[in-house]
Amino acid sequence: MPELPEVEVVRRGLTPYVLGATITDVAVEHPRSIRTIEGGAAELIGSLQGREVTRIGRRGKFLWFELTGHGDYACGFPQQGLLVHLGMSGQMLIKTQNSALHPHRRIRTTIVRSDAQECFELWFVDQRTFGYWAPTTFVETAHGCVPEQITHIARDLLDPQLKRENLARLIRKKNSEIKRVLLNQEIVSGIGNIYADEMLWAARIHPQTPASHLSVAQLSNLLEHGQRVMNAALDQGGTSFDSLYVNVNGQSGYFDVSLHAYGQQGQACDRCGSNIIREKFANRSSHFCPRCQLMH
């Protein structure tokens, strides 16, 4: 599943094409991509067609478009928008008109930029159909103004409003394993299996260490490493292990060549030379160094 860096790469890639552009046509080509919408395709089309995109936002693994033309305003910007979740394999691709059809295209929109007199298409491609688009209303919360469907999603590590020490204190109150806490999107969002393993390796913390056994200083250091790892991944276009994650131009990221723990089982630890091991963890796997990452 795309994690924070991959979704942020998509957001940044969409911005020069979509920001300030008007959505002139919408075609829904697979019902699962709009499964959360009671009014179906008609509701999605009505909420998007003729609207201008004024901002592209993100929290954790969620994207959203803020749209003009709905009259009411909330939190200082238009009240209505579009929420996007990429699921396991979702892609937001910028295409010229009359591009060859993709077998897993689920939604097609036509976008017009009046300033550049450009017309192109934005496709939602999703092989496994776990992703979705949905109209949304923005609401004010204690953690900022966000789409109503994701008010329970916490700030992420790249959110400029995140207070790292406050988050460290919150995490320390949890008795669960530290990796399980990092994966809880209601505590801190955007972290999945890849970046949890990488930030724990960087901070020399065993993934099954109870969060309450770590000091605020250790947890703050862990979160700082997480920020560094994610920024490094952003610089390299995210992590791609197959063709399911690509940027808006269909290009894969290459952070996978910089991974120290995730997927490195049997390989020498880049820090101490011991073999990285893989263990089952909560219906997935953890990758860590048994020498560098001791249980606290």
Swiss-Prot record:
Organism, as annotated: Corynebacterium diphtheriae (strain ATCC 700971 / NCTC 13129 / Biotype gravis)
Protein name: Formamidopyrimidine-DNA glycosylase
Annotated zinc fingers (FPG-type), start-end: 260-294
Family: Belongs to the FPG family.
Single GO biological process annotation from the record: base-excision repair
Chain's role: Involved in base excision repair of DNA damaged by oxidation or by mutagenic agents. Acts as a DNA glycosylase that recognizes and removes damaged bases. Has a preference for oxidized purines, such as 7,8-dihydro-8-oxoguanine (8-oxoG). Has AP (apurinic/apyrimidinic) lyase activity and introduces nicks in the DNA strand. Cleaves the DNA backbone by beta-delta elimination to generate a single-strand break at the site of the removed base with both 3'- and 5'-phosphates.
Subunit structure: Monomer.
Record EC number: 3.2.2.23, 4.2.99.18
Taxonomy of the source species: Bacteria, Bacillati, Actinomycetota, Actinomycetes, Mycobacteriales
GO molecular function term, any single one: 8-oxo-7,8-dihydroguanine DNA N-glycosylase activity
Cofactor info, note text: Binds 1 zinc ion per subunit.
